Amino acid sequence: MADSALINLSKLFPEASLKRKIFANTVQSPIESCLSIKQLNNIYSEISSRCKANPEKNFFDHSLNVLNINYKITSGAASSIPKTGPVFVVSNHPFGAIDGLILGSILQSQREDSKILANFLLGMMPEVQDKFISVNPFGGEKATRANLKGLRDAGQWLKSGACLATFPAGIVAHYRPEMKSIHDGPWHTNIARLARKHSATVVPMHIEGKNSSLFHLLGRVHPRLRTAMLVRELCNKCNSEVNIRIGSPIPANQFKGHETNESLVRYFQMRSDILSHQENTEEETPLPTEQVEDITEKQDDSILAQDIENLPPSALLCEKKAFQVYVATADEIPHILQEIGRTREITFRAVGEGTGKALDLDQYDQLYHHIFLWNSETSEVVGAYRLGLVDEIISKHGTKGLYSSTIFQYSDDAFDSLGKTMELGRSYVIPKYQRRGTSLSLLWRGIIKFVRRNEGYSKLFGAVSISDDYHPLSKGLILRFLRKNKLQAGFAKKMKAHKKPTFEKNRSLKAFNYPDALPSLENVSGLVSELESDKKGVPTLLKHYLQLNGVILGFGVDTSFSDALDGFILVDLDEVNPTLLKKYEGED
């Protein structure tokens, strides 16, 4: 065996020893053939020759060319890796050496000042030693010393403002009985410590695929058998294509909510894992065409304006420039109400909801007050809410008079403990105004004014929707967070959903069973936005209610509204932060 070989098993024995001579003359060749070591040495020889012939091309690209392995970035883009400042790219580790070659190729295409913190075996090749910072995953006193040096070097590299990448699991993905799947082991907390200490932007990545069944079967017998198979696994990936997903960068200022490095590194792992659940689907029509009616045409502006003119002065709750917020009952605004039903349907269909009818109006619209935002310059209904005085509605119609009774069944004394409350719902802002935060703020200024006008009321409740357009895993993540952190269990016993949500039973949630890694709704939103094809996070309205110190009373599925997941939420204005409340009330 030539000394230039990448791997020479005879070197396991002392040079010139009898054992080495016997091994080399008897079993070395068949063992190296069985483990594909001979094939790897031939591959490495070709790579080395190409590096010498064309030094302008980096080692990683030469290696992938010789192996005939192509990678395809199916989500995100390599260009999302920041070009300056300390960056830490973290990825799962499904294959072994191939992962390092692909990661190196991607990084070198974006930043020349990039290195990989990885198994020392990946850095054995002299052509690439300057691109690796080595650690030893095999344990022992010597490994501990080497790893301390590797972590120090990694810290210095990040401190210099350079780019570092790693596989935080330390070892290749394997079968995990507790998850009943092939998956990375828990990621090492040192990765979070380094990222936090050096304020590095973290970029999650996910490499799609897994090693052979034989690899995982032998690994269940003994982990070292898995290690022995790694060369064979590298060689059997020749002539293949690997899909890569690159997530959104996580800036260092988002680390603060994680009190421990264990929590933070679990969050990094989740951000990588969630990428594997993305779906490559084109946008579809939210409702089957045979069930959808054409939306009614808008009425003449003068007809709508006449409804506004007919309102009493007290109907105006607040205004700002061309925008006015009014409150009215159904019989006071017959034409505006039709426009509300029209624009509701437009808005909800755009996010996979909606009734499928020409107008989104129902019998509850006749029992509720309507708070709507009017643009007097363009004669547009920009958005609206409807509010019902619960005690008055129940006294006349029972709990069946509440829209939420279509989703939940209430006990007879359900509302006794809440006192005087208002049910709000069917909230929307038309698409062209949704990026303007002032629309929702103005509506809420009007809502608060209306509540204050009605003495004794301070509590608002209603269903906030998470549309069926969301990925089932997104809904499961949101639901689990709310149940753990925001559920008021006492009231939940007094209501029963007609159809209970089942998203928490999603098998994929097992990979995200680290509740401490999601200390805030913003962390959940980060996962959700990676998963959703349109990059939407947790619904804005849900975040808005929770910002107002809202609590969840229960969960249900609205079967009459495109099977939207509804969280039944309660906001007590007397419990809202006074500074925040003044902001909504329009006070300085």
Please provide the spans of the model-predicted regions:
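Membrane-anchoring hydrophobic helices of lipid-metabolizing enzymes
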Residues: 1-93, 100-102, 109-113, 129-130, ...
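Non-catalytic C-terminal accessory region of glycerolipid acyltransferases
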Residues: 2, 9-15, 113, 148-296, ...
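Short acidic (Asp/Glu) patches
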Residues: 74, 84, 88-90, 96-103, ...
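Secondary-structure boundary elements
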Residues: 109-113, 156-163, 196-201, 350, ...
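Conserved nucleotide-cofactor-binding alpha/beta core module
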Residues: 113-147, 151, 158
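Conserved N-terminal entry element of GNAT/NAT acetyltransferase domains
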Residues: 290-331
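Short amphipathic alpha-helix that is part of the acyltransferase structural core
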Residues: 317-370, 374-389
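Acyl-donor binding region in acyl/amide transferases
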Residues: 345, 355-358, 391-551, 556-566, ...
